[in-house]
Amino acid sequence: MPKISELLTKHFRLAPVRPDMVSDNWIRWSRDPVLMAQLNARATQPTRADIQRYVVASWKSKRMIVGIYARTNGEHIGIYEATIDPRHGNVRLDMLVDPQSYTLSRVLPETDPALLQFFAQEHRIEKAVAVVVETHIPLISHLETTGWLKEGVLRQEHAAVTGNRRLDAVQFGRLLVAEK
């Protein structure tokens, strides 16, 4: 499987996250109850070693973790997690951008095209899919306004991490075309 070394956009650098690259920001994101609630995840108190083990396990299971870094100062500002299904020619993406540093609407319109083009060219991926829990309003808004097709709503797909209810998930898809 071809590996991503680095993708550069005007303002950002995308690069695979190795265990030694786990940032203080990533640790902070995991501990932020407001950010984690948007993702329907519990805020935890992970150590650097915990996240490093997660990175190793992800790469072993063929899930790519791609960091988003500011080109000006190298700050780690977000993450893409990508699970490639070569048999069906698709990739499932999860995205996180640090709301204290940047907004999704500033970062993803610039980084999405570069990463999606990489998948189309290097992995022959034809379709990207993102399944977003209903509480992540900023990501849903981004996907709706940047050419992703809302394919459906999965009713009561996820148990809420807080409270006693279930949450809907919205599935988005985007067909990719490899430029020659």
Model-derived regions: residue spans:
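Acyl-donor (CoA/ACP) binding surface of acyl/acetyltransferases
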Residues: 1-22, 32, 72-180
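Hydrophobic pocket/interface hotspot
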Residues: 25-26, 35, 51, 93
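Structured interaction and signal-relay segments at domain junctions
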Residues: 29
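Generic structural signal for secondary-structure transition and capping sites
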Residues: 34-35, 63-64, 124
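Conserved GNAT-fold acetyl-CoA-binding loop/helix
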Residues: 34-53
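Short, contiguous strand/loop micro-motifs
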Residues: 38-42, 58, 102-103, 126-127
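A generic secondary-structure signal
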Residues: 53-57, 118-119
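A short helix-loop-beta-strand connector motif used in the catalytic cores of GNAT acetyltransferases and
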Residues: 55-67, 78
